[in-house]
Regions:
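A short SAM/SAH-binding and catalytic strip from SAM-dependent methyltransferases
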Residues: 136-148
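Short cysteine-rich clusters marking metal-coordination/redox-active sites
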Residues: 3
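A short acidic, Gly/Pro-enriched loop at the edge of an enzyme's catalytic core
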Residues: 125-136
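Conserved class I S-adenosyl-L-methionine
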Residues: 14, 18-70, 84-85, 104-107, ...
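A short glycine-rich, Lys/Arg-flanked "PGG" loop and its adjoining helix->strand segment in the class I
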Residues: 150-162
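C-terminal alpha-helical "lid/dimerization" subdomain adjacent to the S-adenosyl-L-methionine
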Residues: 167-238
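C-terminal lobe and adjacent flexible extensions of AdoMet/dcAdoMet transferase-like proteins
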Residues: 239-246
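Class I SAM-dependent methyltransferase SAM/SAH-binding core
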Residues: 74-126
Length: 246
């Protein structure tokens, strides 16, 4: 498939445009996790968190509600994952989804049905899409651990039309600060719980610990001045929403 944004021809494999088959650093840690047996096991804990917030659809609607309500919207979904919420979007919307995980993209492709959906294997920091092509961009559950979250957000701004909407959501980076054993001076126990009980694995857990102090509101404000930031999911998640400058 030819990409007018960069002038490259990319191969199509199993219905997915392969823009970047090999990744590094944080993105490689994410690939190793989501392509492994750990992800389905961790999904239970994600589901349990959403259950405590009224169910998965109600929880995700706290993010999806900020997308524009317009017909035939062109949506860019960065870190689309398995596309669990695709069925909850209007059927006349077209979606381009990018992710680093082949396993997640394959699951997303199977879920798509008749929706106008194009999938890309690639990184958020280097989106193979044209400038100002989309009406909105969405990213749920990947932003904290992109190789360069600020660069990824600037790429979303580039890809969305002036005046368009960008919606980003994830867990708060310092979520593990809420765990019991950290309060009593035993953070190693909490690390074991996250890695072994919650099934994130050692590499992903190390990454979570490394980025506990990531300044999400600061990144959001630098790239999208005046954007709205709020905590959701009983304080364990966040969403920020902004408009691309005219």
């Amino acid at each position: 498939m030819f990409c007018p944004a960069c002038g490259h021809d990319y191969p199509i494999e199993a219905g997915v445009m392969v823009a970047k088959p090999y990744v590094s650093d944080n993105n490689k840690v994410s690939v190793d996790f989501y392509n492994s047996p750990l992800w389905p096991k961790f999904r239970f804990w994600e589901w349990f968190t959403f259950l405590c917030n009224g169910g998965e659809r109600r929880s995700r609607d706290k993010v999806l509600r900020y997308l524009p309500k317009q017909p035939n919207l062109k949506l860019l979904d960065v870190a689309i994952g398995d596309g669990v919420y695709l069925d909850w979007l209007p059927s006349d919307w077209s979606v381009v989804g990018i992710d680093v995980s082949t396993v997640q993209l394959e699951a997303c492709r199977k879920r798509a049905g008749t929706r106008d959906l194009k999938l890309i294997l690639g990184e958020a920091e280097d989106l193979p899409v044209q400038d100002s092509r989309f009406d909105a961009a969405l990213s749920i559950g990947g932003f904290n651990y992109f190789n360069d979250p600020e660069k990824a957000l600037r790429e979303m701004v580039r890809a969305v039309k002036p005046g368009g909407t960008i919606v980003v959501s994830d867990e708060i980076p310092n979520l593990t600060d809420r765990m019991l054993f950290r309060y009593i001076g035993l953070p190693g126990v909490d690390r074991w719980i996250v890695s072994k009980l919650f099934k994130l694995g050692d590499e992903f857990t190390d990454m979570v610990e490394k980025y506990r102090t990531l300044d999400i509101p600061g990144i959001a404000e630098r790239v999208l001045p005046g954007c709205r930031y709020e905590r959701i999911w009983m304080g364990v998640g966040y969403v920020f929403v902004g408009q691309v400058p005219e």
